[in-house]
From Swiss-Prot:
Homotetramer. Belongs to the metallo-dependent hydrolases superfamily. MTA/SAH deaminase family. Zn(2+) binds at residues 57, 59, 205, 294. Catalyzes the deamination of three SAM-derived enzymatic products, namely 5'-deoxyadenosine, S-adenosyl-L-homocysteine, and 5'-methylthioadenosine, to produce the inosine analogs. Can also deaminate adenosine. The preferred substrate for this enzyme is 5'-deoxyadenosine, but all these substrates are efficiently deaminated. Likely functions in a S-adenosyl-L-methionine (SAM) recycling pathway from S-adenosyl-L-homocysteine (SAH) produced from SAM-dependent methylation reactions. This is 5'-deoxyadenosine deaminase. GO terms for molecular function: 5'-deoxyadenosine deaminase activity; 5'-methylthioadenosine deaminase activity; adenosine deaminase activity; metal ion binding; S-adenosylhomocysteine deaminase activity. The lineage of its organism: Archaea, Methanobacteriati, Methanobacteriota, Methanomada group, Methanococci. Pathway: Amino-acid biosynthesis; S-adenosyl-L-methionine biosynthesis. One of its GO terms (biological process) is S-adenosylmethionine biosynthetic process. InterPro entries: Amidohydro-rel, Deaminase_MtaD/DadD, Metal-dep_hydrolase_composite, Metal_Hydrolase, MTA/SAH_deaminase. It comes from Methanococcus maripaludis (strain DSM 14266 / JCM 13030 / NBRC 101832 / S2 / LL). Coiled coil: none annotated. The gene is dadD. It catalyses: 5'-deoxyadenosine + H2O + H(+) = 5'-deoxyinosine + NH4(+); S-adenosyl-L-homocysteine + H2O + H(+) = S-inosyl-L-homocysteine + NH4(+); S-methyl-5'-thioadenosine + H2O + H(+) = S-methyl-5'-thioinosine + NH4(+); adenosine + H2O + H(+) = inosine + NH4(+).
């Protein structure tokens, strides 16, 4: 058990008791109520306790791609830099990148993430060791080639079976077709069938740039959401669509009708000059918005607090509307909405929810005065957290990983980058 004493929880000083991996009680809890031998007591004085953040779109092993290709357009970035480097990936490199990336997320308050990448056994190994929660998909790209399609579907299915057989509630599977401009109709149709068979979500890039939309229109005569909807891709499945930058009215209507989650990646979209997602229109149509960092190659970090702030600010400026996205909504994008998208019983601090939470020391200049906590967390906090509990276990204590040798991780990450870049 874990007992957090005297933290600011939902606006007032309270205690919180964790039993197993569940928040058992919130309120005034005496130490005499618990067994001292079986309970870890955490002093929450001067701290605010918040739900762990949820990153709904990333490529965690790409922590090693940080800074390798800045200030260029997406298609040049992909074909000229990222894809050539990815051709050199191996299990060792992906393991090192995932260790580095998951530590970065935990140290900035993220407790769960939604990933699409390769070498899933290496990702799973690192996730298991760091203690973070994850939804993982093998990234399928068939480039309209039948032989490659069969291989990709086989690997995706094997990955789902592997994750299923882990019997680890922290690690769940998903299906990750890359995008409509890199995947054939056949692989996309098979994705829907597999998602229903395994009862897992679909994670896909959608409408990130005008160029990719034009590619789909030229091939099919329809915009990407219209094209996928024409053969039932969104039917009877939970779909998380990353980016959603350039959307027509009909596409927004499809998202609304099919209960699609938008994974908004404001920093990555700005850095690659892809554009700005019409989040205000999504909200007006009751389309749930979540937040992602994308990979470090296009961000260049995985600090979701930066995405929360960006989401709160950008849409004010774009819409000339100071209440386009208010602080509470932006924070919900990164917590409550993400939990719904990934079907995780978290995202809020309530009794009966999973014990995935973060403690932040408020004795900092950028978090003072303490009366305005909600505003500070969105507009002034830098993301450096003190303690993180995931699945009822303390994984970060006083800013340091509990069960991971951080120096060793930095060492193997540097070695992996050297192998990748040379």
């Amino acid at each position: 058990m874990i007992l957090v004493k005297d933290a600011i929880i939902t606006g007032k000083k309270q205690d919180l008791l964790v039993e197993g991996n569940i928040i058992k009680k919130i309120g005034n809890i005496s130490i005499s109520e618990v067994s001292k031998d079986e309970t870890e007591i955490i002093d929450g004085k001067n701290c605010v306790l918040i739900p762990g953040l949820i990153n709904t779109h990333t490529h965690v092993p790409m922590s090693l791609f940080r800074g390798v290709a800045d200030d260029i357009p997406l298609m040049e970035w992909l074909s000229g830099h990222i894809w050539p480097m990815e051709s050199k990936l191996n299990e060792k490199i992906v393991y090192a990148g995932t260790l580095l990336g998951t530590i970065e997320m935990i140290k900035s308050g993220t407790t769960a993430f939604n990933d699409m990448y390769f070498f899933l056994d290496s990702i799973i190994k690192a996730v298991d060791e760091t203690g973070i929660r994850s939804t993982i998909a093998y990234g399928m790209i068939d480039l309209f080639d039948e032989e490659k399609r069969e291989k990709e579907l086989k690997t995706a299915k094997e990955s789902l079976e592997m994750i299923k057989n882990l019997n680890n509630s922290r690690i769940t599977g998903a299906l990750g077709p890359h995008a409509p401009y890199t995947c054939s109709k056949e692989i996309l149709e098979s994705t829907n069938a597999l998602a229903r068979e395994y009862n897992v979500p679909i994670h896909i890039h959608m409408n990130e740039t005008l160029d990719e939309i034009n590619q789909v229109v030229e091939k099919t005569g329809m915009r990407p959401f219209e094209y996928l909807n024409s053969f039932g891709f969104f039917d009877n499945v939970n779909t998380i669509c990353a980016h959603c930058v350039h959307l027509s009215a009909s596409e927004i209507q499809i998202m609304k009708e099919k209960n699609i989650f938008a994974a908004h990646n404001p920093v990555s979209n700005l850095k690659l000059a892809s554009g700005v997602s019409p989040v205000l229109k999504l909200l007006e149509n009751n389309i749930p918005v979540t937040l992602g960092t994308d990979g470090c190659g296009s961000n260049n970090n995985m600090n979701l607090f930066e995405e929360i702030k960006a989401a709160a600010l950008i849409h004010k400026g774009v819409n000339l509307n100071p209440v386009a996205v208010i602080a509470k909504d932006a924070f919900d994008f990164g917590t409550k909405n993400g939990a719904k998208a990934l079907n995780i019983n978290s995202g809020e601090i309530k009794e009966g929810k999973l014990a995935d939470f973060v403690l932040i020391n408020m004795k900092k200049p950028y978090l003072t005065p303490k009366e305005n906590i909600e505003s500070h967390l969105v507009y002034s906090f830098n993301g450096v957290v003190d303690k993180v509990v995931i699945d009822g276990k303390l994984v970060l204590n006083d800013g340091k990983m509990v069960n991971i040798d951080e120096e060793k991780v930095y060492e193997i990450a540097e070695e992996a980058y050297f192998e990748l870049a040379n």
